[in-house]
UniProtKB/Swiss-Prot annotation:
Membrane topology: Multi-pass membrane protein
Domain of life (superkingdom): Bacteria
Cysteine pairs bridged by disulfides in the record: none
Chain's role: May form an ATP-driven capsule polysaccharide export apparatus, in association with the CtrC and CtrD proteins.
Official protein name in the record: Capsule polysaccharide export inner-membrane protein CtrB
Organism: Neisseria meningitidis serogroup A / serotype 4A (strain DSM 15465 / Z2491)
Keyword set includes Transport: yes
Alphabetical UniProt keywords: Capsule biogenesis/degradation, Cell inner membrane, Cell membrane, Membrane, Polysaccharide transport, Sugar transport, Transmembrane, Transmembrane helix, Transport
Entry's family note: Belongs to the BexC/CtrB/KpsE family.
One GO term of the biological process aspect: polysaccharide transport
InterPro entries: Bact_polysacc_biosynth/exp, BexC_CtrB_KpsE_VexD
Localization terms from the record: Cell inner membrane
Main location: membrane
Transmembrane segments: 32-52, 358-378
Length: 387
């Protein structure tokens, strides 16, 4: 019995050696899980934990306003006010579009090395052209648009400008420069509207002056050709002359009747008769000149004279109205129609809210799990379909 014990012990030892060892949980993970979950999460952890650069956002708010008190303009002035200037609510979109435009970027380049701010700072994945593959100006413009954002509140009319960069001071500097450029744009819009308004008003005045000149020339020609300078005064003169001639005719007729009654053979009678005929002829001619049917009569000339005279007066009144509107337009245009009012100045952030490191790491892990689950389900479905 004692000789069989070593054999039994040896057999038991061999059996224990043949038992498989338990694998660690890491080794139990499938390669797919490593590829879709673990490796991306580790990369995200390393990048956001040690390499990702802080990004600072400077914020400011502004509003584009127009003066509340608008001077009242009549006639042409109201038309000029309507056509010369847009509402401030419309121009805010112009300012917003400009701040994200190539023109604004070009203006920033003249004031500061804005490309160096984004190309020479930050980690290789965050900065512009980190791998040296796309250094074109158009590529930088698209990068710039991602770093400048504007939100407009249509209820309050306030716009919020946000600028993000890798340095707090640089973000503040860019934000401040954009606000100043927006104010320059508003001034340019005001000046352009001012020039358009005054130019249009001046054109109206010039047109009215031409009408006055033309009407004045027509009136002068009529007066010279017809010998009439003041129809009413000239008519009064002629009527007065007729009245005097009629009075003289009455006197001559009275004398003639008296002489015939006293001395029918008086030698003065032929002279008085001749004088009577002359007066009657003169009165007849004067009456024809006033109301006769000839073209030269005052009655026929009165209608044409009145038309030419009224055209001249109307042209002068239109010129006076145009001059008044021009002065009103100049006074209105000299006032600043629109202005950019900064509500809050660009701040210098002392805390970087981007990148959100924990959120990005967790998001990478969750997305990896989702991808892993989808791939596993697809693989199982394919295997089941084959079987």
């Amino acid at each position: 019995m004692s000789e069989q014990l070593p054999v039994a012990v040896a057999t038991e030892t061999k059996a224990e050696r043949k038992k498989p060892k338990k694998k660690s949980w890491i080794k139990k993970l499938s390669p797919l899980f490593w590829v879709t979950v673990i490796i991306p999460t580790v990369i995200s952890l390393v990048y956001f934990g040690f390499f990702a650069s802080d990004r600072f956002t400077s914020q400011s708010s502004f509003v584009v306003r127009s003066p509340k008190s608008q001077s009242s303009l009549n006639g042409l002035g109201a038309i000029l006010q309507g056509t010369g200037f847009a509402r401030a609510q419309d121009d805010i979109y112009t300012v917003q579009e400009y701040m994200q435009s190539r023109s604004a970027l070009d203006a920033l380049r003249k004031k500061m090395p804005i490309r160096d701010f984004y190309e020479k700072e930050g980690d290789i994945f965050s900065r512009f052209n980190g791998f040296g593959l796309r250094g074109e100006d158009e590529a930088f413009y698209q990068y710039y648009r991602d770093k400048v954002s504007i939100h407009f509140d249509s209820v309050s009319g306030i716009s919020n400008l946000s600028v993000t960069s890798f340095n707090a001071g640089e973000s503040q500097k860019i934000n401040d420069a954009l606000l100043k450029q927006g104010e320059v744009l508003i001034n340019q819009l005001n000046e352009r509207a001012r020039q358009d308004t005054i130019r249009y008003a001046q054109e109206v005045v010039n047109s009215a002056e031409e009408q006055v000149k033309e009407a004045s020339v027509q009136l002068t020609k009529f007066r010279v050709s017809n010998g009439i300078f003041d129809l009413k005064a000239q008519s009064d003169v002629q009527m007065g002359l007729v009245s005097k001639l009629q009075d003289e005719l009455i006197v001559i007729q009275t004398q003639l009747d008296q002489v015939k009654a006293v001395t029918p053979e008086n030698p003065q009678i032929p002279g008085l008769i001749a004088r009577e005929k002359s007066l009657r002829k003169e009165i007849s001619q004067q009456m024809k000149a006033i109301s006769g049917g000839g073209e030269g009569s005052l009655s026929n000339q009165a209608a044409e004279y009145q038309r030419v005279y009224l055209e001249n007066e109307l042209a002068e009144k239109q010129l006076a109205a145009a001059m008044t509107s021009l002065e009103s337009a100049k006074a209105e245009a000299d006032r600043q129609q629109l202005y950019l009012e900064v509500i809050s100045q660009p701040n210098k952030p002392d805390l970087a809210y981007e990148p959100n490191r924990l959120y990005n790491i967790v998001a990478t892990f969750v997305i990896g799990l989702i991808v892993y689950g989808i791939v596993v389900l697809l693989s199982a479905s394919i295997r089941e379909h084959k079987n």
